[in-house]
Amino acid sequence: MKVSRRVFLGNLGALGAAAAVPDNARAWESKAPPAPYGCLVDLTRCVGCRKCEQACNEVNKLPEPEMPFDDLTVMDRLRRPDHRSYTVVNRYYTGRLDDRDRLAPTFVKVQCMHCQDPACVSACITGALTKKENGTVHYDVEKCIGCRYCMAACPFEIPAYEYHEPITPRVRKCTFCYERVEQEGKLPGCASICPVEAITFGRRNDLLGQAHARIDNDPAKYVDHVYGENEVGGTSWLYLSGVSFAKVGFHEMPTEPMPKVTETIQSTMFSYLWSPIALFAALGALMGFTSRRSRSKEDDHDA
Amino acid sequence: MTHDPKPVKAPFWTPGTLVMLAFMAAGALTLVFRYTFGLGGVTNLNNHYPWGIWIGLDVASGVALAAGGFTTAFLAHILGRHYYEAVTRPALLTAALGYTFVAIAVFVDIGRSWAIWKPIFYQNHTSALFEVAMCVMTYVTVLWIEFIPVLAERLGSRIPLLAFLDRILDKTMWIFIILGVVLSCMHQSSLGTLLVIAPTKVSPLWYTPMLPLLFLTSAFAVGYPMVIAETTIATSSLRLESEMNVLSPLSRFTILTLGVYMALKLGDLIMRGAYATLLDGSPQSNSFLVEMGLGVVVPWFMLLFGTVRRSRRLLFAAALMIVGGVMLNRFNVFVVSFKAPYATEPYYPAIGEILVTAGAVATIFFLYRLFVTWFPVLSARRQEV
Ligand code: SF4
Ligand code: SF4
Ligand code: SF4
């Protein structure tokens, strides 16, 4: 038995050495679809009517809101999307004045950004979240185990959770109206309803072109930044603003996609399981060596 | 062989075990609420702070503190230092109990407990959590397999299956021993990878792409101190001999492992320039100072002295500081350092979360005592020459 074990370990060592050549030479590559849809939100146009919230609620069959959608006093405090509302509109006063010298509000619609290389998708343990070819970051409740790693990973803190469901809680976030767009060929609920065309739906590349054209045509009206163009490697939802983004609730984000570092670590260490196999072989060889040595010592004693 | 594990002959029902029962009952009651009112009913978790102490302490610290299992297995079985076999069984028991409770903590923390098997079939290979889950799942199994001989020694005559498995394992145990070390290295490091995906949320004092390496080296470092701490507690509460003849030499290895961890950690801090915020008095920097100062630097210097390594009290103190330091490190990474920029209020653990955690710890102590009373785990007392 002992001898055969050594032979086996030797074979294992060879196997480990062969596997120890990882193909980690290839650098990390973005998995973003080439021509995703997107939405361009122009904050200079938004009038804060909350119609997009209402449309989203109806299209996605969400529960009745606590306060009716025509009640604008909800904007007195900052809100975040939650499990009952996939999008909310917040109001900011940045010191900007209107043409009658009164403080002018800026309204900001918040929802999932549908990142090009989403942290949530990379993190999800079961692949319940996926980036679709049309740009949607899609949630499949059938696979979800409720670990909430997507929530810990999302830089925009978007996925919301049904914390008061004891057995079957779901992760809730803007669906980009996936079925509506993909199967019915319609606009997302929010984009279709907006009375002032603050939300433009289209191919992300076209939207970026439009956004820069608007800035170029009226440089006094806009800050020269399309939020979402490069943030976290790019998002499908893009924003134009007349005031500094930092003043209306947008945080500065790295331009590297969030999953880049972790995915590089994971694939470098575990492609073809080379490192565990190599370690197993090395430890096996070591164990074989030490047990032979201690056995021969025992033999000496016996003699 | 110098060691000869025997069941401990000590009365089982003591005031201590009764206190543990009380904590266990409180924890169990909280779980009833958890499965009646949801996570929101008993925790302070919210959309910005989705992970609390059940992940930061029960899972992350739990995994780290079970490192005594694979580090002693490596020393005694793989390196062949049979002298240390006296502590492999208690370390194995702690690891098996620890990991079993890590799995239970995950089960309770995930919203859809009934779906816990799903990652086996729906695999996402870019997810560090997927790797942690697979390794922990496999490792729990491996640990209990490694424990079978202990069970068989006591029950083999009554349960033929155990005796049968024991005989098979006699020839194959080396596979499981190596597998245990490999799996430990994998998931100890992947546990550190988890929050690398959230650079905007983790404080720069802890955020580094080196987190996986730091988690791995700190797991190496905490292994023997954990064995020293638990053996000292067990031998003194069960009135056994102190086993200092094993623990003192064991502590010498920690000078190296803890030293490597300290060097990596301080080097990383300096390279990234993150030490700049160290004295700003924020909860983060204070917690970092305690973690590194009391948990790493001071005990490392203590261990340099032979008088400390030979004194039961001082060695216990140093080991306890290292154990506390690594626990605090996991807690810091997952809870203290985690700041969600969009959050409107911070996270503090709710009483329900604390009760469940305390209940889990009490159950581990309770079961440990139960096992050492029934099964041949500890070899103290008759081990002296
Ligand atoms: S915003 Fe968050 S939830 Fe939405 S795709 Fe990006 S990472 Fe995922
Ligand atoms: S909570 Fe669900 S969707 Fe989110 S990471 Fe976990 S399994 Fe994936
Ligand atoms: S795209 Fe659809 S789900 Fe998302 S905010 Fe608009 S209406 Fe709601």
Describe these PLM feature segments.
Chain B
Residues V63-T71, V222, M292-P299, T363:
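Hydrophobic alpha-helical transmembrane segments
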Residues M20-A28, A96-A103, I178-L179, A317-V326:
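Hydrophobic alpha-helical membrane-insertion segments
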Residues R34-N44, Y49-G52, V59-I159, M173-Q188:
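Transmembrane-helix bundle segments that line or gate the permeation/cavity pathway
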Residues G306, R310-V385:
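TerminUS-proximal long segments
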Residues K6-W13, T17, L21-G27, R81-Y83, ...:
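Long, contiguous internal "core" modules enriched in hydrophobic/ aromatic residues
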Residues F101, C185-M186, Y261-L264, M321-F331:
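Aromatic-anchored segments of alpha-helical transmembrane domains
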Residues M1-G68, T72, F338, F365, ...:
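N-terminal signal-anchor module of multipass membrane proteins
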Residues V32-L57, V108-F130, S189-P212, R239-S242, ...:
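Membrane-interface interhelical loops and short amphipathic "cap" helices
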